[in-house]
Amino acid sequence: MLSVNGVDRLDKIRILGIDPGYAIVGFGVLDYDGVNFVPVEYGAVLTEANTPFTERLKAIHEDVEFIFEKFSPDHMAVERLYFNSNQKTAIDVAQARGVTVLSAAKRNIPVSEYTPLQVKQSVVGYGRAEKHQVMEMTRMILGLAQIPKPDDAADALAAAITHSLYSRFTS
């Protein structure tokens, strides 16, 4: 029996990776059995630039709720936000991230955060890897024919992979 962060499964754990944003929220759902990764679904929640911000948050919330209902993840992994310049953008992305975390919290689904360095280290084996290296390794690890598009979906899958690897050593 596999036990990951308190979730006992005979065969697998389902992880929802989220790449937060307010224009695009990347998501990736994968199953992990302790050895193998099986990509279930990935994509992006898109919002229109000319839509009022509160309506964008509402749209993100509704679409993420649908993802939770459809795929029933056991855990959510999200990349920790890091911004060095535009505070307005950082605040807006943080609010969109909060909407996604709320969907997990409503279901008592644990949420784990990973820094970009942790994601790169987990997926590529090198914490200073370039974005294209992370995307290519994500494709290879998951056995996909092509790099997931949009990039936000690949980032979300990388966060889910990171969680599966970290949870092996913390459970």
Q: Which role fits each region the language model picked out?
A:
Residues 1-171:
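Phosphate- and other anionic-substrate recognition elements at nucleic-acid/protein interfaces
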